[in-house]
């Protein structure tokens, strides 16, 4: 089921078998090293996204502009995910991950995405806060956080990375001008 966010921007669930080659190409590029899949073969990437698809607390979507995929957007429930053990979790938290696809993005894409994705997450009345936790070494991601309305939280040592937590509160969120 495709979720229309505006006239040109939409989310559609990842279909591991048919989207596997696309995702494999994205997550095995050096710029995606923080996703930890640089050396994964195609079949393992498909298995990972099949697992995500089967879990009620996880979801993966392709962010599409004019029906073309330009980014990967994932959501998770920190109450179930191991991430929830590393920060002061609250009821109504939803974690998100975002990986931009390669290439020059179309005009208007980034602004629409950063306006509509948090708005879509907050369309669930139970969501009170969006949790982001990129690798602290991912300067591009960390520097973007305040520009999209996120408040930087603590850096936390985790088994696979040092996470820079950031939070977008429902009560204080307005669509950013990116």
Each language-model region and where it sits:
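Helix-loop element at the rim of GNAT/NAT acetyltransferase active sites that forms part
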Residues: 25-39
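Short amphipathic alpha-helical segments
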Residues: 20-24, 46
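Active-site rim helix/loop that mediates acceptor-substrate recognition in acyltransferases
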Residues: 39-60
């Amino acid at each position: 089921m495709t979720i229309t966010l505006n006239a040109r921007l939409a989310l559609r669930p990842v279909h591991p078998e048919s989207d596997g080659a696309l995702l494999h190409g994205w997550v095995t590029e050096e710029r995606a090293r923080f996703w930890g899949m640089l050396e994964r073969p195609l079949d393992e990437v498909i298995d990972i996204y099949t697992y995500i698809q089967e879990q009620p607390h996880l979801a993966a979507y392709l962010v599409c502009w004019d029906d073309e995929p330009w980014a990967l957007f994932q959501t998770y429930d920190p109450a179930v995910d191991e991430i929830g053990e590393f920060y002061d979790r609250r009821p109504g938290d939803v974690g998100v991950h975002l990986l931009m696809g390669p290439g020059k993005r179309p005009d208007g894409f980034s602004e629409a995405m950063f306006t509509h994705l948090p708005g879509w997450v907050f369309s669930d009345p139970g969501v009170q806060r969006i949790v982001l936790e990129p690798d602290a070494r991912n300067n591009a991601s960390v520097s973007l956080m305040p520009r999209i309305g996120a408040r930087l939280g603590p850096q936390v040592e985790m088994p696979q990375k040092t996470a820079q937590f950031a939070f977008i509160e429902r009560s204080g969120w307005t669509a950013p001008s990116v």
